[in-house]
Amino acid sequence: SDPGDSVRAGQHEDINLITLLMGASAEGLEVLNKQGEWVGITAIPGSLVVNVGDMLQRLTNGYLKSTTHRVVNPPKEKWSEPRYSIPFFLHPVGKMPLNALAQCISDTRPRAFDDITAGDYLNERLVEIGLKKN
């Protein structure tokens, strides 16, 4: 059937520190660039794609931005082909503070996020997106 404008995974940022992506079996991964345009990403064979997650964004006080990404459907001629991807989500231990690193705070870049532990932040976000009840 025709998937129309549907996407395989809607626009989002990962909650964790970083996500490592080994080469997917088919195209479809797109990232949102600074100009607000979706750009297709294909891993170079033998390499990884690294997505910055929300936790790393907090630690760096926004110096490193979470990667906004999605997975779109392939062109019509490839609809019947499966797409496999092996993401590795790196999460810190729950008690790790996600406080902004001192070297990432300045007079021109004040603290952007409240202090919180990784576990509390993960729980907060999972409740926020409806994957966990409070």
Each model region followed by its residue ranges:
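C-terminal flanking tails of non-heme Fe-dependent oxygenases
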Residues: 1-134
